[in-house]
Curated annotation (Swiss-Prot):
Keywords: Amino-acid biosynthesis, Arginine biosynthesis, Cytoplasm, Transferase
Enzyme class: transferase
A GO cellular-component term linked to this record: cytoplasm
Keyword DNA-binding: no
Sample GO molecular function, one term: amino acid binding
Signal peptide residues on this chain, from the entry's feature table: none
Residues involved in L-ornithine binding: N162, D220, S224, M225
GO terms of biological process kind: arginine biosynthetic process via ornithine; citrulline biosynthetic process; L-arginine biosynthetic process
One Pfam entry name: OTCace_N
Family: Belongs to the aspartate/ornithine carbamoyltransferase superfamily. OTCase family.
Predominant cellular place of this UniProt entry's protein: cytoplasm
Protein name, as recorded: Ornithine carbamoyltransferase
Pathway: Amino-acid biosynthesis; L-arginine biosynthesis; L-arginine from L-ornithine and carbamoyl phosphate: step 1/3
Amino acid sequence: MALKHFLQFNDLNADELAHIFERTRWIKEQFKAYQQYWPLTDRTLVMIFEKASTRTRLSFEAGMQQLGGSAIYLNTRDSQLGRGEPVEDAAQVISRMSDIVMIRTFEQEIIERFAANSRVPVINGLTNEYHPCQILADIFTYIEHRGSIKGKTVAWIGDSNNVCNTWLQAAEVLDFNVHVSTPPGYEVEPERANLYGTDHYEEFTDPMEAARGADLVTTDVWTSMGFEAENEERRRDFHDWQVDADMMRVAGKDALFMHCLPAHRGEEVTADVIDGAQSVVWDEAENRLHVQKALMEYLLLGKVQV
C-alpha cells in the first residue's frame, strides 16, 4: 500500500472508514476475550507531544503494545524539536528510525510539514484545528450503540473548536448532519463554513433548537488548551450552552450523549447527563484504544482480512 497519513478526517474515504470500523469491532472482541493479536510485532510507534495528554498517550502506547509493537514517547521540551530543529529535519530522522509516528501539537501546519517529509505514516493525535482520532472513536461508539450514522443528526453544543471542525469533515465523508450552536463570537469560521458547505451542517443561535430531535448530543470544555487566559470570559459567554437534562429531553429518549473528556461537570455538561443513562462517554473513551489500533493496522498493513 502507498504511504498514507491520517492528518484530517477526510484523509480517509467512506470505504476505508467502513473497513476500519469493522476491524475495530473485531480487534475489540479479541481484546475482551483475552485473545492475543500481534500483527505489528517489531514495529515501532514514535509519539511526539507538544500538548499534554492522558487519553491520547495511553491509548496509543497501550494500543501499539497490544498489537505486538513498541511505543516511544517524545516531548518537545526534551528533544531537539523544542530547541529549534526544523520540523522537516526531525521528520527525516525520526521516520528512518520508526515505522509510524503520532503527533499531538498546536498548529496543523506543523504536522502537515512533518508528514510531507516523513517516510512512514503520520497520525494527527490532536491539533488546534482537528482531532480526527477522537471522531473515529465517537462514530464507532455511535455505530456500536445505534448502528449506521448515515442520515443521522449530531448536535454540537459549545465552542467551534477542533472537535467541532472534525465533526463537520466527518459529516461530509459519511453523509450525516451536524447542528452547531455556539455563543455569538464563537461561530464556525467563515472560511471553514465555505470549505464544508451547508449540505451537511446548519448553525443555530438557540442550543435547544440545535439539539431538538438529534440522535447524538456532544460537547467539549468551554476553554480548550491554549485559551486559559480567556477562561473567565468564556465561562460568562458559554453559560447558556450547557448540556443538561432539559436539552437531552428535547433531543429525545434515544439520543446519546458524548464528550471527548476531560469534562467539567457543572459547566459544559451537568453531572446528571454525563453520568446518566444516555451517556456513553466511558465507551467512547475506551474506543479510542481500539479504533486507533485498527487505524495503525490499516496504515501499516492495508486492508487486513481475518
